[in-house]
């Protein structure tokens, strides 16, 4: 799994282990963002974030802020690793 476009293009993203999380495929994210158009300056909400790929893709494409909601500890660890790999800031509540 990788970031499709933007500032983090080509960066590899990790998915949480196990079968409780099913990451959105690269092609699906690419299609979603093609339909959405520009996300520059927008705020993004990623519910049931899993790997955080959707939010990270949005940040890569210029979104101003992303809020990720996830309760699975393994998924949270994957999100943290993915944010660290891209250099995106994390503020946790």
What residue spans do the PLM features occupy?
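Class I S-adenosyl-L-methionine-dependent methyltransferase catalytic core
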Residues: 1-93
């Amino acid at each position: 799994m990788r970031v499709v476009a933007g500032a983090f293009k080509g960066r590899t993203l990790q998915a949480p282990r196990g079968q409780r999380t099913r990451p959105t495929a690269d092609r699906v994210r690419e299609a979603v963002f093609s339909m959405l158009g520009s996300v520059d300056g927008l705020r993004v909400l990623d519910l049931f974030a899993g790997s955080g790929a959707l939010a990270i893709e949005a940040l890569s494409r210029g979104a101003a802020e992303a809020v990720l909601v996830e309760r699975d500890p393994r998924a949270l660890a994957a999100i943290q690793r993915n944010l660290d790999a891209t250099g995106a800031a994390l503020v946790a509540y």
